[in-house]
Amino acid sequence: MLYRTVPKTGDRLSILGFGCMRYPSTRTGGIDEERTIRQIRQAIDGGVNYLDTAPVYHMGKSEVILGRALADGYREKVRIATKLPPWSVFDRDDMERILDTQLETLQTDHIDYYLLHSLSKSSFESMKMLGIFAFLDSAKKDGRIRHAGFSTHANNAVFREIVDSYDWDFCQIQYNYLDEKNQAGTDGLEYAAGKKMAVMIMEPLRGGNLAGRVPAAIQAIWDKAPVKRSPAEWALRWVWNHPEVTVVLSGMNDEAHIEENLRVADTALPGGLLEEDLATIHRARDEYWRLMKVGCTGCGYCMPCPAGVDIPGCFASYNTHALFPHDRTTKFHYIGQHGGLMGEKSSAGLCRQCGKCAKACPQHLPIPALMKDVAREMEGMMGVVVPVLKGGLWCMNKLGRVRRFVTGDKSHA
């Protein structure tokens, strides 16, 4: 296993991190807890020392199972990363309650890497008003958290604003060879690294879509390469090729995939790809773009939208759905990111057809017309799904307040 150093702390982290959002399931659809624990320990025994979870993953069960997996001496071998969900925070007491509950759930006295989860511009402004920086300072001072950071799918401008707002130790962004200009992108990666922040990467395989069953035209490119690698290995090596990257998270839930990722992480040095390797990846990237429904490059010239639509983000989800129609999670990711579930609503259905975006688009895309297509394809169930999921998150938060009441802290119940 190769390791990279967190600039501000000197902490040495495995370049491969274990993402705890996609645990293996049983035939009946529940989490296969025994297999999950075996897989987590398999990764740790192979050198992984960074594990990333969150309260919302598996509707609260991810942290519970991770805490159990880290018994028997495994906690001392790793760094735990988990997240504070802004959508469950309404006052400073909620911050305290959620963190203390996480410590109990994870069976630990401290969180090594603590993130504000999936920050958007509005959720970040709300958290600042509620005193998030004072909370982070206090939690670091009393030892409950060691390092503070954030994750985000926001555009580059918002990302830079968040980076500049606080003395963060690290951040977490989506990054892969299709997202060089999407969300924070390469510019954001380099900007954060220039601030001496560690950068953790999520979605290096775009939820697994850049691995496994890829379009035939893409597989043909990999097959013609002089070096034989799986689609997953090509994608992971591309991310690790960037020296600014600290950890790449993989939602590993298959023993063979864990072994493959561990093998690749033994040799994936920054700057290790040859020019012909990069040319092969660029051909695959260009073919993906050719296959996409919308030729959006994610440049952001169309933003901000007066109606609040995340135009590049909506197009990215729409293209992913077109490329990987077998992936049933794409629409749910769209709803989560743009349907108002974990931040302000930014879906295509908000488009007012004003045309401002089309005038600014360097690709000359008919954006208002395309927004109708995106809404038609991606938002059919949004009016039903979002209220249901929001209700679930509200119940999780309410249960926390009830727990606080029955344990005696009645002043905040």
Placement of each model-derived feature along the sequence:
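N-terminal binding-site loop/beta-alpha segment at the start of enzyme catalytic domains
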Residues: 1-78, 141
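Conserved, mostly hydrophobic/aromatic
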Residues: 6, 18, 43, 51, ...
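Conserved residues at the C-terminal ends of beta-strands
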Residues: 19, 54-57, 114-117, 151, ...
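Glycine/proline-rich, positively charged
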Residues: 27, 31, 87-205, 213-219, ...
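Structural motif
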Residues: 42, 46, 105-106, 166, ...
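Structured C-terminal cap/extension of enzyme domains
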Residues: 49, 68, 187-413
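Short catalytic-loop micro-motif centered on adjacent basic/acidic residues
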Residues: 50-56, 146-150, 172-173, 247-249, ...
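Structural motif corresponding to the early beta-alpha repeats
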Residues: 57, 73-92, 117
